[in-house]
C-alpha cells in the first residue's frame, strides 16, 4: 500500500510538471493563467510567477488585466520577493484607480516594505518607508478593511524607531565621561528624542537621563559656570517630575535634585 501511495505521488508530480512545462511553452494566455492558479493553490509560487509574468503584458487594456496583475503581485509577496511585490502593488494602485482591490494593493505596498524592515539595531530606512506607506493607507482609508492591522504594524515599527533613537542617545551618555563634548552631545540627543518621539515609552528614560547628563555637565564645568548649568538641570527635573510623577526613575531623579540643591547651598 505504501509503495502504491509513493507511485501515485510520483505520477501526480510528473503530470503536474508536464502541465507546467506545457503552459510555459504555450502561447495560450488563458492556459497559463489556469495553470498558474493551480500552482498558487499548491503554494508553488515561483512556477506561478514564471507563468504570470509572461501574461501580464498580454492582458493590459483588457477586463482581465487587473485580476492577473493582482495575482502576480500576490505571488511575488508569497514567494518572499518583497521588493518586487511592493513595486507591483504600487503599479497596480496607480494603474487601477477605480478598482475595488486598490485599497488592498495600497495596504500591501506597506506590508511588502514591512517584511524588508530589519531588526531595530540595523539601519531603519526600510522601516521608515513602510511606516510612511502605512500612514498613506490610514489617511486614504480611515475606515478601511485593513485599518486594525495597519495600526498594529505602525505601532510595532514606531517602537523600533523609538528604541533605535533612544539607544543612540543612551550611547552618547555612556561615552560622555570619556569624550570631549560628550555631555553636550548626550544632552542634545535626549532633547531631540523627547521632541521627535513624543509618544514613545522611552520618554521618561530620556527625561531622566537628560537631568543626569546636564548635572554631570554642570559639575564638570568651570566653577563660574556651574550655578547656571545646575539651574538648567533643575528645570529638566521640574519638567520630569510634572510629566512622570510615577516614573521608575523618580527616586534617582530626586537624589539628583538633592545633590543640585546641596551644591547650591
Q: What residues fall within each predicted segment?
A:
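Sec-dependent bacterial lipoprotein signal peptides
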Residues: 1-17
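Acidic, polar-rich low-complexity tracts and alpha-helical solenoid repeat scaffolds
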Residues: 16-265
Amino acid at each position: 500500500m505504501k509503495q502504491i501511495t509513493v507511485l501515485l505521488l510520483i505520477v501526480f508530480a510528473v503530470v503536474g510538471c508536464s502541465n507546467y512545462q506545457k503552459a510555459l511553452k504555450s502561447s495560450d494566455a488563458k492556459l497559463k493563467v489556469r495553470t498558474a492558479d493551480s500552482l498558487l493553490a499548491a503554494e508553488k509560487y515561483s512556477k506561478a510567477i514564471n507563468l504570470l509574468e509572461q501574461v501580464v503584458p498580454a492582458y493590459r487594456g483588457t477586463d482581465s488585466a487587473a485580476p492577473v496583475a493582482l495575482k502576480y503581485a500576490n505571488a511575488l509577496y508569497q514567494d518572499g520577493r518583497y521588493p518586487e511585490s511592493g513595486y507591483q502593488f504600487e503599479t497596480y494602485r496607480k494603474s487601477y484607480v477605480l478598482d475595488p482591490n486598490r485599497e488592498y494593493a495600497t495596504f500591501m505596498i506597506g506590508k511588502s516594505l514591512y517584511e524588508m524592515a530589519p531588526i531595530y539595531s540595523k539601519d531603519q530606512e526600510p522601516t521608515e518607508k513602510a511606516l510612511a506607506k502605512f500612514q498613506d493607507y490610514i489617511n486614504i482609508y480611515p475606515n478601511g478593511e485593513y485599518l486594525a492591522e495597519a495600526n498594529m504594524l505602525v505601532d510595532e515599527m514606531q517602537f523600533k524607531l523609538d528604541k533605535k533613537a533612544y539607544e543612540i542617545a543612551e550611547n552618547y551618555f555612556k561615552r560622555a565621561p570619556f569624550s570631549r563634548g560628550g555631555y553636550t552631545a548626550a544632552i542634545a540627543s535626549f532633547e531631540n528624542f523627547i521632541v521627535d518621539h513624543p509618544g514613545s515609552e522611552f520618554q521618561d528614560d530620556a527625561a531622566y537621563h537628560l537631568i543626569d547628563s546636564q548635572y554631570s555637565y554642570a559639575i564638570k564645568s568651570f566653577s563660574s559656570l556651574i550655578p547656571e548649568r545646575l539651574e538648567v538641570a533643575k528645570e529638566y527635573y521640574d519638567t520630569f517630575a510634572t510629566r512622570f510623577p510615577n516614573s521608575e526613575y523618580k527616586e534617582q531623579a530626586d537624589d539628583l535634585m538633592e545633590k543640585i540643591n546641596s551644591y547650591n547651598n
